[in-house]
A protein has these predicted regions:
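Short, Lys/Arg-enriched N-terminal segments with co-localized hydrophobic residues
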Residues: 1-12
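Conserved C-terminal guanine-recognition region of P-loop GTPase G domains, centered on the G4
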Residues: 110-111, 115-130, 134-190
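Short, hinge-like loop/turn segments at secondary-structure boundaries
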Residues: 59-62, 121, 150-152, 180, ...
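C-terminal accessory "lid"/substrate-recognition subdomains
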Residues: 158-164, 169-297, 309-311, 319-320
Length: 320
């Protein structure tokens, strides 16, 4: 069995809040959202809410930890059920699973302001709020307005995207009527079609939006900004065979050095190494790396993927 030896690196995780009253269709929307990206995502279930994803979408891959239980979704997303304190749960996920995005689905009666306050206490350069999303049930809107208007007003105050669910057959005019009833301000995105018909740019903006939580007097405010996609450079791949490394400390140093961008913008490193009849596998993704024991020997080689690779320097590093 492979066993972790070293895990180092920074964490950068964006939190996407998806709220809505009981039965609004949050889980169905989350499933569609996850299917629209290849990014690494964790969905959190804890005392603020119950995820209740249908069993057919879950694999029972419990990791047997007492405080945090993990299931893997069929499309590679991870669902967490935890009995830790809410903020502790977020920090634990950031430092153990380290996803690009954490989707939090609170219960249908959770106070969103309280959740955002807690997120603010742990927001820093490596954890930030993403786009808050409100799911509005078109079939149950009158009931919510008549009986739970305070709850709905709280949610409308802290969102950047309003999604009308159960609206597959609605006309654009009917969407506009709901927008007017809710008095959605111009700062919130309000698509006039069901999300199954959205163009890719709406889905991309969900992942590209960053939020800053601010205190204005006694009130909280969220300032949102869409980060435009940069022009992507074509990734290059470089393979080095028969690498010459005889100490794990040296390998650890090399992987840290590769993150410095002195030998290129390196996105991924994967390799195998044998030292004193012990076999190891090493991986680097972004600013995180891991060295683990390997049951089998696969030689001494490394594959480096990135842009602007300084191949001569890379070869020197792994061959001396």
């Amino acid at each position: 069995m492979a066993f972790p030896l070293f895990v180092f690196g920074g964490v950068f995780m964006k939190i996407i809040l998806i709220t809505g009253f009981l039965g609004a269709g949050k889980t169905r929307f989350i499933k569609t959202l996850v299917e629209k990206t290849t990014k690494s995502i964790v969905i959190l279930e804890n005392e603020f809410g119950d995820l209740n994803l249908d069993g057919e979408y879950l694999k029972n891959n419990n990791n047997n930890q007492d405080d945090i239980k993990v299931w893997e979704l069929t499309n590679g997303c991870i669902c967490c059920s935890t009995n830790l304190d809410f903020t502790h749960s977020i920090l634990t996920i950031a430092n153990t699973i380290n996803p690009e995005f954490l989707i939090i689905e609170p219960s249908g009666v959770a106070k969103i302001k309280n959740i955002i306050k807690k997120i603010k206490t742990i927001s820093y350069e490596r954890i930030e709020l993403g786009l808050p999303i409100l799911i509005v049930d078109s079939k149950n809107l009158d009931n919510v307005l008549n009986n739970y208007n305070d709850y709905l007003s709280d949610e409308l105050k802290y969102n950047g995207l309003v999604v009308v669910s159960k609206s597959e057959s609605m006309t654009e005019q009917e969407f506009l009527e709901i927008k007017n009833i809710l008095n959605v301000d111009n700062e919130s995105v309000f698509p006039l079609i069901h999300y199954s018909k959205w163009e890719n740019d709406i889905w991309e903006n969900i992942f590209n939006t960053s939020g800053t939580i601010e205190n204005i007097g006694n009130e909280l405010s969220i300032r949102l900004k869409v980060n435009k996609n940069k022009i992507e450079k074509k990734l290059d791949q470089y393979t080095i065979d028969n690498i010459q490394i005889n100490l794990l400390d040296k390998l650890s140093y090399l992987l840290l050095y590769l993150m410095s961008k002195r030998v290129g913008n390196i996105e991924r490193v994967k390799g195998y190494l044998t030292i004193k009849n012990n076999s190891y596998k090493f991986d680097l993704v972004g600013t995180n790396y891991e060295i683990t024991g390997s049951d089998k020997a696969f030689g001494n080689n490394v594959v480096i993927i990135g842009t602007d690779l300084k191949k001569d320097k890379l070869k020197t590093l792994f061959m001396n």
